[in-house]
């Protein structure tokens, strides 16, 4: 005999996990769709809380050549379901761009064709944040930085002709 009751109990969990798998698949498809000379799709994901609300940050990017400091021939799209204003999103990007996307180079060639955008769907009804210094943004900003750094590193690891990844840390300069 089959354990029908046990199976019935697990169906809601299965449906939820399928939604998660389907969601990840959609992001992989999106990252694959924007590839040009890239050999792999580039995507990153983080979760955290703003107040008591769970929020997600997804990012996809393309680029593998003409990547020099201050971005070049690359596209990056970051999305969050957090409800944050355009001013907050802009400030968060400004605070994190120099140590991520603006710090990478592949071949030293630059281009005018680069872009990073940050979208908020506002789907999550998190607490209203009006100031970039609001302590409820601390963990969110860390997670955003992780997504941006992850995507930046994926771009240079997939650089045209890249065989090595070199990180230079300068202290007491």
Q: What label would you give each PLM region?
A:
Residues 38, 61-65, 82, 107-117, ...:
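Glycine-rich beta-alpha junction loops
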Residues 1-16, 20, 111-114, 151, ...:
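Proteins with a high burden of low-complexity, intrinsically disordered sequence enriched in S/T/G/P/A and R
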Residues 22-31, 45, 101-113, 150-167:
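Flexible, glycine/charged-enriched surface loops at secondary-structure junctions
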Residues 56-59, 77, 117-118, 167-170:
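Structured core elements
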Residues 65-70, 88, 107-111, 115, ...:
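Short, contiguous, pocket-lining structural segments
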Residues 1-101:
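Glycine-rich, mobile lid/loop segments that gate access to catalytic sites or pores
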Residues 1-8, 75-76, 113-133:
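Glycine-rich, flexible beta-strand/loop modules in the N-terminal catalytic cores of phosphate-handling
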Residues 118-173:
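A glycine- and small/hydrophobic-rich beta-loop-beta segment
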């Amino acid at each position: 005999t089959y354990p029908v009751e046990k199976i019935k109990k697990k169906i809601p969990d299965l449906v939820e996990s399928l939604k998660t798998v389907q969601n990840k698949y959609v992001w992989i498809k999106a990252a694959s769709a924007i590839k040009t000379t890239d050999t792999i799709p580039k995507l990153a994901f983080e979760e955290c809380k703003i107040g008591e609300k769970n929020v997600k940050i997804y990012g996809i990017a393309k680029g593998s050549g003409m990547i020099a400091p201050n971005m070049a021939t690359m596209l990056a799209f970051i999305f969050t379901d957090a409800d944050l204003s355009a001013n907050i999103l802009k400030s968060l990007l400004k605070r994190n761009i120099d140590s991520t996307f603006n710090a990478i180079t592949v071949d030293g060639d630059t281009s005018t064709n680069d872009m990073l955008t940050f979208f908020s769907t506002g789907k999550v009804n998190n607490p209203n944040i009006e100031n970039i210094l609001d302590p409820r943004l601390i963990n969110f900003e860390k997670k955003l930085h992780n997504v941006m750094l992850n995507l930046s590193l994926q771009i240079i690891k997939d650089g045209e002709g890249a065989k090595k990844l070199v990180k230079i840390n300068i202290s007491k300069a």
